[in-house]
A protein has these predicted regions:
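Helical subdomain adjoining the active site within ATP-dependent kinase catalytic cores
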Residues: 148-153, 179, 183, 277-304
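ATP-binding pocket architecture of kinase catalytic cores
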Residues: 31-121
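Regulatory N- and C-terminal appendages and interdomain linkers associated
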Residues: 1-12, 164, 171, 175, ...
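Active-site acidic catalytic loop and adjacent metal/ATP-binding pocket
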Residues: 61, 174-226
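Active-site activation/catalytic loop segments of kinase-like enzymes and analogous catalytic loops
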Residues: 222-253, 265-291
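ATP-dependent phospho-/nucleotidyl transfer catalytic cores
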Residues: 119-194, 242
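ATP-binding glycine-rich phosphate-binding loop
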Residues: 3-28, 64
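A glycine-centered beta->alpha junction motif in the catalytic cores
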Residues: 77-91, 111, 140-149, 267-283
Length: 304
């Protein structure tokens, strides 16, 4: 590996520090670098997009002597980039706010319109409707199981007393999906952009103003970055939709995007209640927090 890095990057390696299974901190006479093994050779296309659009929010990749992004080592592939020191001391709320500012910049800079057929919306709506019906059946079965029990655990009572919220949320998902169907019936384009799809506090370097990972970047609807964040909401303990203002104040969603986002967020995620009662209470509490959070965002998107 030392000889390969010297030949490919003209760097003299002193040693390696394993950070994760795929990431190594490489100490060279020229300084510190990040070596990351990747499986997706399509990353070259992503980097080309980033460089072509002159996106400043990502850590630059060091190209090898062949001017390529990726370098092969035995049966593996890796890329090399500058090493940035972690800034974990920064308050998470500030990191999250900065992350959404980066998303709004990434999305707005890379937007383009893409032509679609009528069948695209038809399939999309059918797929979402099927998922909603599956969730309704799933939660109805859990409710039925709790209803026949002579003794209910604390989790059982939490579920029974809050089942109406789940039921209402899924009902709203179907109603919003109907609104979405009515609105897109005459559309023949969608707005696509680069989406990040990989929120992680460790990837956010505020001091340098960079996101250090781009392995999961895809071309998609911008709303999926917001949707994916809400699937992680149990990990976040602050007022999520207020922090989202740092995104919405810089980027205005189209009406069809708002409707689709609202619909997807109302598709209640699946929870699994098992034999660990303490864990079950935590799972239920997180679900209730999710329902409250999307209710707040739904009002905001409806008003906007």
């Amino acid at each position: 590996m030392n000889e390969l890095i010297k030949e490919a990057y003209s760097l003299e390696v002193i040693g390696y520090i394993k950070v994760t299974k795929k990431v190594y901190k490489v100490k060279c006479r020229e300084g510190f670098f990040c070596l990351k093994f990747v499986e997706d050779n399509g990353l070259t296309v992503v980097i080309d997009h980033i460089e072509s659009l002159h996106l400043k929010c990502f850590l630059p990749v060091i190209r090898n002597y062949k001017k390529q992004v990726l370098t092969s080592y035995e049966d593996k592939t890796f890329y090399l980039s500058p090493w940035l020191a972690s800034d974990n001391a920064i308050v998470k709320e500030l990191k999250l706010k900065f992350y959404y500012e980066c998303l709004s910049y990434l999305h707005s800079t890379s937007f383009f319109n893409y032509s679609v057929s009528k069948s695209f919306f038809k399939r999309q709506i059918e797929d979402i409707a099927n998922i909603i019906h599956e969730r309704q059946a799933y939660y109805n079965e859990i409710m039925s199981n709790f209803e026949v029990l002579s003794y209910r655990s604390p989790t059982g009572w939490m579920f029974v007393l809050n089942y109406h919220k789940i039921e209402c949320c899924l009902k709203n998902a179907l109603e919003i999906l109907d609104c979405y169907r009515d609105y897109v019936c005459n559309l023949d384009t969608i707005r696509l952009c680069l989406t990040y799809n990989n929120f992680n506090y460790a990837h956010i370097m505020m001091k340098e103003g960079k996101l250090i990972s781009f392995d999961h970047i895809k071309i998609n609807l911008c709303i999926y970055d917001i949707y994916n964040m809400y699937q992680k909401i149990p990990e976040l303990i602050f007022d999520f939709d207020v922090i989202l203002d740092s995104y919405f104040c810089k980027l205005k969603l189209l009406k069809e995007e708002k409707l689709l986002l609202r619909c997807l967020l109302h598709v209640v995620p699946i929870i699994k209640l098992e034999h660990d009662e303490i864990n079950n209470i935590i799972v239920m509490s997180r679900l209730l927090y999710y329902l409250d959070s999307i209710s707040s965002l739904n009002k905001k998107l409806s008003i906007d």
